[in-house]
Structure formats: structure tokens, C-alpha cells
UniProtKB/Swiss-Prot annotation:
InterPro entries per UniProt: Asp/Glu-ADT_sf_sub_c, GatC
Encoding gene per record: gatC
Classification via SUPFAM superfamilies: Glu-tRNAGln amidotransferase C subunit (SSF141000)
Name by which UniProt lists this protein: Aspartyl/glutamyl-tRNA(Asn/Gln) amidotransferase subunit C
Organism the protein comes from: Acaryochloris marina (strain MBIC 11017)
Family membership noted in the UniProt record: Belongs to the GatC family.
UniProt xrefs under Gene3D superfamilies: Glu-tRNAGln amidotransferase C subunit, N-terminal domain (1.10.20.60)
Alphabetized GO MF terms: asparaginyl-tRNA synthase (glutamine-hydrolyzing) activity; ATP binding; glutaminyl-tRNA synthase (glutamine-hydrolyzing) activity
Record key words, sorted: ATP-binding, Ligase, Nucleotide-binding, Protein biosynthesis
């Protein structure tokens, strides 16, 4: 059984501020979810082949087709900053 103190601790670690009502609600909801997982763990799946999907699905994405775009200047004109033929963006990683 999930205790309210456990929900409060996880909320604190996640930097979430819960009201008393939310804490009670999440304790009940998460407890129900954990009970369901407990039921699932009782199933005999020894004969079930491991899979990542419930149904067999093949690649459903479309094929990418490269389409040249010759008006590079108009795209670069929209950039807040550029260098030569490239977008210039702020550095996000420090020196290592």
C-alpha cells in the first residue's frame, strides 16, 4: 500500500508543491496504478515472446525526398544572426 508520506517525499524531490487534496488524490491514484502492476506481475508470460509493441507494425513513415532549395539568401535573411552561408546560434556548451 502506498503511503501519503511517500507521495509527499517524491513530490518534494521533484520540486512539486502539492496541496493536501492533491496529495491525497495522488496517493489514491498511484496506489491504484501500483496495485494494477501487482496484478500484471502475477500473469504467466513464460510462453509469450518479448516484444516492444502489442501489434506487429512496420515502418509507417513516409520516404524522405531531398528537394533542392536555391534561394538560400531568403532563408538566411530570416535568421537573427548569420555567418557566411550558415545560421549563427548562441553557444550552448562550454569548453571541455
Amino acid at each position: 500500500m502506498l503511503e501519503r508520506a511517500e507521495v509527499d517525499k517524491v513530490a518534494h524531490l521533484a520540486r512539486l508543491s502539492l496541496t493536501d487534496a492533491e496529495s491525497e488524490q495522488f496517493t489514491t491514484q498511484l496506489g491504484d496504478i501500483l496495485d494494477y502492476f501487482e496484478q500484471l506481475s502475477e500473469l504467466d508470460v513464460a510462453e509469450v515472446e518479448p516484444t516492444t509493441r502489442a501489434i506487429d507494425v512496420s515502418n509507417v513513415t513516409r520516404v524522405d525526398h531531398l528537394t533542392p532549395y536555391d534561394d538560400r539568401e531568403s532563408i538566411l535573411a530570416c535568421a537573427p544572426d548569420q555567418e557566411d552561408e550558415y545560421f549563427k546560434v548562441p553557444k550552448i556548451m562550454g569548453e571541455s
